[in-house]
Curated annotation (Swiss-Prot):
Organism, as annotated: Parabacteroides distasonis (strain ATCC 8503 / DSM 20701 / CIP 104284 / JCM 5825 / NCTC 11152)
One GO CC term on file: cytoplasm
Family, as annotated: Belongs to the elongation factor P family.
Recorded metabolic or biological pathway in which this protein acts: Protein biosynthesis; polypeptide chain elongation
PANTHER family registered for this protein in UniProt: ELONGATION FACTOR P, ELONGATION FACTOR P (EF-P) FAMILY PROTEIN
Keywords: Cytoplasm, Elongation factor, Protein biosynthesis
Protein known as: Elongation factor P
Role played: Involved in peptide bond synthesis. Stimulates efficient translation and peptide-bond synthesis on native or reconstituted 70S ribosomes in vitro. Probably functions indirectly by altering the affinity of the ribosome for aminoacyl-tRNA, thus increasing their reactivity as acceptors for peptidyl transferase.
Taxonomic lineage from the root: Bacteria, Pseudomonadati, Bacteroidota, Bacteroidia, Bacteroidales
Protein's gene: efp
Biological process, per Gene Ontology: peptide biosynthetic process
């Protein structure tokens, strides 16, 4: 059990029988009354977010989680197979439990988050930024660097990303896996 004022980003709690991760928190001291803790919580299973307020000193059930590096080995329909980097155990994770799955290529290292008490897998987190090669996009025209116009491009994993006009096929780009946005071009 933890007190509500001890909640930080990344804290996992059990609330109404569901697991939530704290995405954001704020201590609020109104002009009158007691201080409250305003939080944004992400449902581990469904992925939705809720806003929740707690009184300071309110007891909450915390869940101890472990993050371990796993390597993506192969896919089998909607199920993805990962190998533990330390014990070489194989773990199967459903596609909808993997954040940033569209940008994952074979051999990618991801963090698998599991409940430490039951050893059940909660979800898998991709690195925030990945580097992928552009396999198809319309050719860029010289001088197309002045505007912020974007065009569609397909990367090596098959995902489609919006990129600036000057990006061409064969170039390596950096992508933010949380929202699928273009970050920059990688020069070799």
């Amino acid at each position: 059990m933890i007190n509500s004022q001890d909640i930080k980003k990344g804290t996992c709690i059990r609330l109404d029988g569901k697991l939530y991760f704290c995405v954001d928190f704020l201590h609020v001291k109104p002009g009158k009354g007691n201080t409250i803790m305003r939080t944004t919580l992400k449902d581990v299973v469904k992925g939705g977010q809720i806003e929740r307020r707690f009184n300071i000193g309110e007891k909450l059930e915390d869940v101890r989680v472990e993050r371990r590096p796993y390597q993506f080995t192969y896919t089998e329909g909607e199920h993805y197979h990962f190998m533990n980097q330390e014990t070489f155990d194989d773990v199967i994770i459903d596609k909808n439990l993997i954040n940033g799955v569209d940008f994952m290529k074979e051999g990618e290292i991801v963090d698998v988050v599991s409940d430490a008490s039951t050893d059940t897998v909660l979800f898998a987190d991709m690195p925030t930024k990945v580097q992928l090669k552009v396999t198809y996009t319309e050719p860029g025209i010289k001088g197309d660097t002045a505007t912020n116009t974007l065009k569609p491009a397909t990367v090596e994993t098959g995902a489609e990303v919006r990129v600036p006009l000057f990006i061409n096929e064969g170039e390596v780009i950096e992508i933010n896996t949380t929202d699928g946005s273009y970050v920059g071009r990688i020069r070799e």
